[in-house]
Amino acid sequence: MSRTGRLLLGVAILAALFRLPGLGYPGEEYFDEVYHAKTARQYLNGEPPTEWVHPPTAKLLIAGGVALFGYEPWAWRLVPALAGILIAPVFLLLARRVLASERAALFATLLLLMDGVYLVQSRIAMTNVFAVLFQLTSMLLLLRAVAADELRVADMAALGLALGLALSTRWTSLFAWGFMGLVYLAVRRARAFRLRDLALGALSFVVLPALVYLVSYVPWMAQTHPSGLHAWWDRALAAVAWQKDIWGYHAHLDATHTYFSPWWTWPFLYRPTWYFWFSGGDFVRGIVALGNPAIWWASLPASVWALAVGIRWRDPRLVFCGAGYFLLYLPWGLSPRTLNFSHYLLEAIPYACLSLGALLDRRWNVGQAILPRAYLVAVAALFLLFLPFLTAMPVPNALWSFRFPGVPVEIGPYRVMLGGFGIWTWFPSWI
């Protein structure tokens, strides 16, 4: 096996070690599984879907595990876990294509593997992990396609299919779709407007994604058992019309939630989302979608650095990393949807990891290897610290309830308390 093959296998195994064990706990649907897992079963039973506010692809994939192994907790989480595992080698390939060295790509991949939200989303039957997988796959295929002097039909067709899967999973993939369009134009430049390139661009960015999106609704169309072509055409038109209802739902959603988090607070981890909580006897168990603080708190400055330095030094690799983060994050500020959660930032975090990988690699190259080593150790330590509440491990009540002593400090006219926080709950908003 080649070195690249060994590295890809290694990161996949590392991802699997944290995603497959204990996949059957909790033993019931929790958080949005009450919608997505249930909808997967309904597709299998030919029933109208409970959850229709996202396109069908993710629920159909979740249904694959249920079809094979029954409606069991580990079965409806199996395909999301496999998607989470697959993200690791896909991202390594993407990082290797984008970043200047293999070491930088490994830094970026290890950082992503140690992110808490990425782990939690890989162990729950929700749509987010599939969106990330298909978006990263699409970007990898795009960079491969545009690197050739002449666009190849097979490469552009593969890109179109992957983009279709991303868009038919979550509409938030439109952010990634727009970013990929900019990358395509930036790399191809004038060549993008040649007749052949225009045709292939339309195929991969419009025609095939639209076709895949429509095909994802075929199981829903078939639920009414249409007996003729005319009936199928009517159902297809109904599926198209349904998109207006999806938009209306998100645009006018005025519900409230305990863990609502404004979009501009996400990089600061102001309000992570608790998905599950159980307290019984001497132990507690919980699952919280909390990003690794060392990664999320660094994501904004690292992306600003990549964008600014990339523009100054005319380094398209760094511009790509920084722009990817902001173009997948900032559109949330324009979204009409008001009920949002911090884990939505997950789709932008891989690009922050690319920026961090590039930054760590530069420090290494100038003889400051101690800095990337110390940072990686800190990231790993925080990942292991929060791991019990990323995977619902039993934690003694005494440890959960423990609080470090607080010390009152006078700062001018203000009196603040230093300390008084828990081992896992550093701020009141984390509870």
Describe the residue ranges of each PLM region.
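Short helix- or helix-capping micro-motifs
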Residues: 12-18, 108-113, 120, 140, ...
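Transmembrane-helix motifs of polytopic, lipid-linked glycan transferases
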Residues: 13, 74, 78-99, 137-141, ...
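Transmembrane-helix signature of polytopic, membrane-embedded enzymes
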Residues: 5-11, 91-114, 133, 147-154, ...
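Membrane-interface transmembrane helices that cradle and orient dolichyl/undecaprenyl
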Residues: 1, 97-99, 138-158, 166, ...
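Aromatic-rich transmembrane-lumenal/periplasmic boundary elements in polytopic membrane proteins
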Residues: 26-39, 209-265, 269, 393-413
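Transmembrane helical bundles and short interhelical boundary loops of multi-pass, membrane-embedded
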Residues: 198-205, 209, 213-214, 218-223, ...
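Specific aromatic-rich, kink-prone transmembrane helix
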Residues: 44, 90, 130-149, 155-163, ...
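Short acidic/glycine- and proline-prone juxtamembrane loop motifs at membrane-interface regions
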Residues: 30-31, 80, 117-131
